[in-house]
Amino acid sequence: MEPGFWHEKWHQQQIGFHQQDINPFLVKYWQQLGLPADTQVFVPLCGKSLDMCFLAEQGHQVIGCELNELAVQQFFSDNQLEMTQTTVGEHQHYQTEQISLYQGDIFTLPNAITQEVTAFYDRAALIAWPESMRAQYAKQLASLLPSGSVGLLVTLDYPQEALIGPPFAVSPTWVEQHLSDDFDIEVLASQDVLADNPRFIKKAVPWLNEAAYLLKRK
């Protein structure tokens, strides 16, 4: 995923990956992480996801990282949230009461920003990367998370040849092979969601599975 590709998607508002509702797996499984209300939660490649509002409503302090400036600005404007903006190194920092977003490259995000994080949520980050870049992202995510951090990972899997991503297909085998060195992995759920995704039906994708994993940083 080249930066120019991502910026163009947002500029053209070709953001089919953005969900208009809170992710059902987040609602169903987040409480299984057993987190105190004031937990700091890291959301990589957060876009303008409404899931961050859900996390804030649980009492959490949300720290997001997003490459595209328009996505960050739309998050605050769409949700009618006042914010302050400052510069932190290479990143622009947007702050409201419980949500703190860093606009810039996740690969240059300072570890100091996430050193107090004890939880994370990845619904649209891992599946945003083509396979050639995905393992590099997974290692960067692990490097940003303190040992013992727990998180919810949501993935999509389908025959990759049937559709040009993003979102890209991430199989259970890939998760096990590439994440198990840094995380303990528990499969929470896997279900067929093809009927809920018209884009995939239109492209004649034969099947589409959404899976939820509980991860714990080793």
UniProtKB/Swiss-Prot annotation:
Residue numbers binding S-adenosyl-L-methionine: W10, L45, E66, R123
Catalytic activity entry: S-adenosyl-L-methionine + a thiopurine = S-adenosyl-L-homocysteine + a thiopurine S-methylether
InterPro entries on file: SAM-dependent_MTases_sf, Thiopur_S-MeTfrase_Se/Te_detox, Thiopurine_S-MeTrfase, TPMT
EC code: 2.1.1.67
MF (Gene Ontology): thiopurine S-methyltransferase activity
Disulfide bond annotation, renumbered to this chain: none
Compartment(s) where it occurs, according to its Swiss-Prot or TrEMBL record: Cytoplasm
Domain of life: Bacteria
Enzyme category, top tier: transferase
UniProt GO cellular component terms: cytoplasm
Biological process according to GO: methylation; response to metal ion
Keywords: Cytoplasm, Methyltransferase, S-adenosyl-L-methionine, Transferase
One Pfam family here: TPMT
Recorded family membership: Belongs to the class I-like SAM-binding methyltransferase superfamily. TPMT family.
Protein name, as recorded: Thiopurine S-methyltransferase
Provenance organism: Shewanella baltica (strain OS155 / ATCC BAA-1091)
Gene from which this protein is expressed: tpm
